[in-house]
Amino acid sequence: MAKRQLTRRQSWRIEKIQEERAARAAKRESRAVEELEGGDLGPEQNGLVIAHFGVQVEVEAEDGELAGQVCRCHLRANLPALVTGDRVVWRAGNQGGGVIVAQLPRRSELCRPDMRGQLKPVAANVDRIVIVFAPLPEPHANLIDRYLVAAEHAGIRPLLLLNKADLVNEENAAGLDALLATYQRLGYPLLEVSARQGAGMQELQAALDGHVSVFVGQSGVGKSSLVNSLLPGVDTRVGALSEQTGKGMHTTTTARLFHFPGGGELIDSPGIREFSLGHVRRADVEAGFIEFRDLLGHCRFRDCRHDREPGCALLKALDEGRIQPQRMASYRHILASLPEPEY
């Protein structure tokens, strides 16, 4: 059944209701912070945001007597928006709970536009983005390339992960092999695993240990199942594929951080079906295709759009086989999806 399209007035009304609810929640939160700060608060200490719940976050104490304990904290009104992975300074309350008083500088952040097109961080201090795909739902190179551009733009190392490798069969093997070969030729690290059967999971654990990683990928590729396999005993509601569409049904409802025994962390974020890159410029997309980098600036015309222009270094490389046709098609598709001024 097709999804019903909202009119502009309906969309405005929904947005207005959400704003009113957010304002009421912020007012209640402000009163809660005032009550906490009116009592006795403990000393300032460092903490790690491991989950975000609207106007409150869960903080894991990193030092002091409470080290390792998790506390639900309120945020001071003057703080910027916090996300899972943020490191903060907080103070514990005498009735439980606590107050976050400062955000520590981020080493990196992974961002995407929200429904209004405004840039919104989704995870902080990540140093590895694991791009998960599977034989089902059918993987699309364009979506993988969008994630790679986002990773390159954020300065976060990507790892390509084919999950549900046990579902590879005669019908999809050739297409998957061609897809994987494209990225292997570019030098991207790639692993094949089966969370259900356990194949390749030790290699994946070794690749994640010592890093702060985030799993991304369309719904239904098994991100929550991977977490359950990597961290037995952790409950991340596992969903199934829709029998009608073959697409994934969303499961995880909030980004959450988990610790690995080897010292690394994993941020499990909500499944997303379409990753928008509306916040990047044309130059960012070009730089996100790593095989373009040595060619950029060598076209005959400074404002070359790499379409039909004579003397284009990228088109020459495409003709010579140094750029794969699939990647050039993805590049053009991504550019076409950008806001008009950036295209």
Swiss-Prot record:
The keyword GTP-binding applies. One of its GO terms (biological process) is ribosomal small subunit biogenesis. Gene3D superfamilies: Nucleic acid-binding proteins, P-loop containing nucleotide triphosphate hydrolases, Probable gtpase engc, domain 3. Keywords: Cytoplasm, GTP-binding, Hydrolase, Metal-binding, Nucleotide-binding, Ribosome biogenesis, RNA-binding, rRNA-binding, Zinc. It is an enzyme of class 3 (hydrolase). One of its GO terms (molecular function) is rRNA binding. GTP binds at residues 163-166, 217-225. It is found in: Cytoplasm. GO terms for cellular component: cytoplasm. Monomer. Associates with 30S ribosomal subunit, binds 16S rRNA. This is Small ribosomal subunit biogenesis GTPase RsgA. It comes from Azotobacter vinelandii (strain DJ / ATCC BAA-1303). The lineage of its organism: Bacteria, Pseudomonadati, Pseudomonadota, Gammaproteobacteria, Pseudomonadales.
